[in-house]
């Protein structure tokens, strides 16, 4: 049965909860997943609210957003507050030293903002090749300034606030300023990740901030203050985003990147000054009676999610319910989607991405016809999408890791789905004097430049944005009204996490908490991956009889989902992480 907390019980008496259809959870709640290392599960209750809601990766961040909404702020206002607090309390995942994608619904229009990091002007395709011409080892590339892309999060937050904000800019920054000055308690998750971290102590500023004099991670509950970050935020509050991209903060970023002792980068002040956020059309596609909308290239996430759903559209997923048959179809659909993603998707300023063709219902029906209900296809080949002529590219080997996600709905029905990142856990493992970690986003590019005699679409190029798997998603119902806001961190696994959750919400009609906590499953066009330590392990034998190469792996999703009902809002925060879904 679903565990319901005090808030739920108090609302039952008001007749609120009775109108919300719920399904019992299908699975146990065991141990958790990667690319950020797993730190265990925490039992969660379904979030319930009547006016507005925030689902985010840390209770302090969610509470900051909730308070902004209670003060009359918009979903965009709340997103600024949530992101800046996350920079403090979940520094391993996101922050102003990184980038983000935002999908915004204003009740009539869907807009996306691309705050993805960019390669410096000096970057070359061979950036991550060693002296022998072979790709560098991943962490040899990650640690240091070489992997740092020009951050986009601050520009994105300012752009969203200018376009959709209601409260003053200073007011939405204030919760993070107060927390940075007065301190916050180190959470078990942050402490656990610091304990597993191998490289962060090599940076003097990070070592002094996160570790004690003996080199041990500061203990759970230790109050951590960040006066340097507080000053950075006050500067941004007074002068806006320009103060990040020019002046002292910009110089601090450049110095930190270029002065790394063993792996310096080549970012310049001009790289920062020239950064712009791109407003792009949302990618929307049908699934059952719903419209699924999200971010287009340079993100591959929404294209791949819609490819998976387009294949599943041909099947009665509702009658399957969670089990080996559903996993077979979701995994085979994932193989097809990842095959296309690896070949076609990159920064649209550099590559003609055939978005219309890849998401065309006819094309997806033809891809679905390749699925044998009784046998896995193994490794799928890319398709040939219609409508757009595209250059022949080589497949990409880009590696992708962790992030954070927030879902927000305000009392006017506006919604934010925002996935935000510094890429790997703790990014490039370098901290600025301004109080924040820098990203290692450039390792999201392919390390190789040519495959099969063809240039790789996602290779490094000057000013280019690396391909992403982030899939912030907003779902509209058949009447074009807001129905759900969904997203997750998790590197390339994000695509499967979001697809699984959408099937749980839309086909199996699960409560968002239950949908988030479903075992993670799928394929990235390699093995069929089942989440270790969950009920999914029992499906391994049945899948192997269909020819699946099954791997049991940790899958550390951080799904945050909100569903709109006639009576209000219900939300879920993945039990694998420490987030919450709360509202007013």
Predicted feature locations:
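Bacterial N-terminal signal peptides
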Residues: 11-23
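Noncatalytic scaffold domains of N-terminal-nucleophile
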Residues: 29-63, 67, 75-76, 80-239, ...
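Short, small/polar residue-rich loop motifs at catalytic or cofactor-binding pockets
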Residues: 279, 400-403, 468-470
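Glycine-rich phosphate/pyrophosphate-binding beta-alpha loops
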Residues: 293-302, 404-407, 417-430, 488-495
